[in-house]
């Protein structure tokens, strides 16, 4: 499972990989490709990345002006194209307004830093969103994964797991340390899927 960040230099100030790079990654290592679109126009780019190997595409609600109808339509289109779909919320975006579309989500990604750059400090108050998502999943009998991205390290991952995260995205911490040791030395950590973010 590989978490693949896509940044357009507009929605977030950084600029990263395009669909051709994803296609190359998929050919070289046929892992499950979790593509996180940090772009101004996810309606345009989601189909392009699916065509080039994305197994799951998540996009920011803010990029669609937090419009529930547009978000629902894009999730439907992603599913129509044969991929899994998910939504992402920035730290300042409430999750509660999107309760009605949770049934269409395969994944909900909570950003625990401002998106765009690695190495930022974990925002612990974002775990309140995780707790809410876990409770709603149980109440509504849904099956979406709860993912968190930003500031995950040897201390914060335990907080994320305790709050209810299924999937942790780690970038800077993984690549600045011994990957094998980090991923497999802690039983609580290795029991969960950690996705290595290509920075």
Language-model segments: what does each one mean?
Residues 18-25, 45, 70-77, 97-101, ...:
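A general structural detector for well-ordered alpha-helical segments in enzyme core domains, enriched
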Residues 3, 34, 58, 86-88, ...:
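Structural detector of well-ordered beta-strand residues that form the stable sheet scaffold
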Residues 7-9, 38-42, 62-64, 90-92, ...:
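Active-site beta-loop-alpha junctions enriched in small/polar residues
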Residues 5, 49, 108, 133, ...:
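Conserved, mostly hydrophobic/aromatic
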Residues 3-77:
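N-terminal active-site wall of soluble small-molecule enzyme domains
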Residues 57-65, 109-120, 163-183, 192:
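Glycine-rich phosphate-binding active-site loops on the catalytic face of alpha/beta enzymes
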């Amino acid at each position: 499972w590989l978490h693949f960040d896509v940044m357009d230099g507009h929605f977030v100030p950084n600029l990263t990989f395009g669909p051709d790079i994803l296609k190359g990654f998929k050919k070289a290592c046929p892992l499950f490709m979790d593509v996180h679109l940090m772009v101004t126009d996810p309606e345009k780019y989601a189909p392009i990345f699916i065509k080039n190997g994305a197994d799951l595409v998540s996009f920011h609600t803010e990029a669609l002006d937090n419009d529930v109808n547009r978000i629902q339509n894009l999730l439907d289109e992603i599913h129509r194209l044969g991929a899994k779909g998910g939504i992402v919320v920035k730290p300042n975006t409430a999750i509660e307004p999107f309760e009605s579309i949770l049934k269409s989500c395969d994944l909900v990604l909570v950003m625990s830093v401002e998106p765009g750059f690695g190495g930022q400090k974990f925002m612990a108050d974002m775990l309140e969103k995780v707790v809410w998502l876990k409770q709603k999943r149980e109440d509504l009998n849904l099956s979406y994964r709860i993912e968190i991205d930003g500031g995950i390290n040897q201390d914060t991952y335990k907080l994320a797991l305790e709050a209810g995260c299924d999937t942790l995205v780690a970038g800077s911490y993984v690549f600045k340390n011994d990957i094998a040791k980090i991923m497999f030395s802690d039983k609580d950590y290795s029991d969960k899927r950690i996705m290595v973010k290509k920075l």
